[in-house]
């Protein structure tokens, strides 16, 4: 997608980071919130817009009178308490700011579990659709109060990518406190802003550097990884300053602002997008190099003959990772057989399945229509 094609975007996810909504002292910046609301109202004319907003933890800390000690991160209960105290005020701020422009806001709090479950994912999609059809602006955040560390989405850059898949967005705009992605630390002399990134490479990831600030969870690296994930789904990602006036309208007018990450050539189906972005494999099917080539290069289904083993337990229809090296899954799909059944037919020809099991559901362990190649596992 070229920059000029951004003018044709009809469904947009806008992610606003904590650094954009707070001042240097960590206080909520209502003036910038009001300015962003005006720009969101402008770009929502003729488009459906979903807002993913950070800031609840920072706002809650301000309300509770808690200060973060430099170098000493808060424990999970403290973060959750801040989120609980801050989220109502965050919604009130957006409701008031967008309401001045005649827009109705709707709070949507999600967890990783909500999106990993196909049923709950589809329920969330139907809710989003009804809200967007009614002209509302869904305001999304992770439900930090109930999410546990090991099951958290973790940062709102990743959440924005997951939400984009849920609402089938054309583009994601991430508003941050810098003008875009630079080829090195922007504080260094000679740092160059990268306007257009055709593909997220290992070099691009290295240039993104380390973690977030004291007030935010994610850093540039989480944004770049989200852009890579979105690109694999056929969604364009833009990274631009949430402090620069009219950057968002300029982006959607095709002007040279921020950094634009080009999408892949093919858009995944709805089911494949969910498998790639939101689903979590309940086990791993280990395959040989020949099976990997058949799946990745030829778009084939996974047959028993290429299977070497199974890790974990899963049932028919469960998401399952496919890997040569179990630490680096290269694909994910929906299992046509349960884990114990796959163990019994591993390495066999399709004509031998019924003899081994006494029955046969399918020729394929994972059908190609229920399988997606994961870019993160490509060699």
Curated annotation (Swiss-Prot):
Keyword Nucleotide-binding carried by entry = yes
Protein species of origin:
Anaeromyxobacter dehalogenans (strain 2CP-C)
**Metabolic or biological pathway, per its Swiss-Prot or TrEMBL entry:** Amino-acid biosynthesis; L-proline biosynthesis; L-glutamate 5-semialdehyde from L-glutamate: step 1/2
SUPFAM superfamilies for the chain: Carbamate kinase-like, PUA domain-like
Question: What superkingdom does the record give?
Answer: Bacteria
Give the residues the record marks as binding ATP: 15, 176-177
The UniProt record gives the binding positions of substrate as: 54, 144, 156
Q: Where in the cell does this protein reside?
A: Cytoplasm
Q: Which reaction does it catalyse?
A: L-glutamate + ATP = L-glutamyl 5-phosphate + ADP
Write down what this protein is called.
Answer: Glutamate 5-kinase
EC number(s): the record gives 2.7.2.11
Q: Which cysteines are joined by disulfide bonds?
A: none
Give start and end of each PUA domain: 282-360
Q: Which UniProt keywords apply?
A: Amino-acid biosynthesis, ATP-binding, Cytoplasm, Kinase, Nucleotide-binding, Proline biosynthesis, Transferase
Q: Which GO terms describe its cellular component?
A: cytosol
Pfam families with a match to the protein in the record: AA_kinase, PUA
């Amino acid at each position: 997608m070229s920059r000029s094609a951004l003018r044709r975007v009809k469904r947009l996810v806008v992610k606003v980071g904590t650094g954009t909504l707070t001042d240097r002292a960590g206080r909520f910046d209502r003036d910038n919130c009001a300015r962003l609301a005006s720009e969101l109202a402008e770009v929502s004319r003729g488009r459906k817009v979903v807002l993913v907003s950070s800031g609840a933890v920072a706002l809650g800390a301000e309300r509770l009178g808690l200060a973060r000690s430099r170098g000493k991160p808060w424990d999970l209960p403290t973060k959750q308490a801040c989120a609980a105290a801050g989220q109502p005020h965050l919604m009130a701020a957006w409701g008031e700011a967008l309401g001045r422009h005649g827009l109705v806001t709707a709070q949507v709090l999600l967890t990783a579990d909500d999106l990993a479950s196909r049923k709950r994912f589809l329920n969330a999609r139907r809710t989003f659709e009804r809200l967007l059809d009614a002209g509302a602006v869904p305001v999304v955040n992770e439900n930090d109060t109930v999410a546990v560390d090991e099951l958290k989405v973790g940062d709102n850059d990743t959440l924005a990518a997951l939400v984009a898949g849920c609402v089938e967005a054309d583009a994601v705009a991430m508003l941050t406190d810098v003008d875009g992605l630079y080829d090195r630390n922007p504080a260094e002399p000679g740092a160059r802003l990268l306007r257009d990134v055709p593909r997220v490479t290992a070099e691009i990831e290295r240039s993104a550097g380390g973690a977030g600030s004291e007030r935010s969870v994610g850093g540039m690296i989480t944004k770049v990884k989200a852009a890579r994930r979105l690109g694999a789904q056929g969604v364009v990602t833009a990274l631009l300053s949430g402090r620069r006036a009219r950057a968002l309208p300029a982006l959607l007018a095709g002007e040279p602002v921020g950094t634009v990450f080009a999408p892949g050539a093919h858009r995944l189906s709805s089911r494949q997008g969910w498998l790639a972005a939101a689903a979590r494999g309940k086990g791993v099917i280990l395959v040989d190099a020949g099976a990997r080539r058949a799946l990745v290069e030829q778009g084939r289904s996974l047959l028993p003959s290429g299977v070497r083993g199974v890790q974990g337990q899963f049932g028919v229809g469960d998401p399952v990772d496919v890997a040569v090296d179990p630490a680096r899954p290269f694909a994910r799909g929906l299992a046509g057989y349960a884990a114990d059944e796959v163990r019994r037919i591993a390495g066999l020809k399709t004509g031998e399945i019924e003899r081994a099991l006494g029955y046969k559901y399918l020729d394929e362990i994972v059908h190609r229509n229920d399988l997606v190649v994961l870019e993160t596992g490509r060699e």
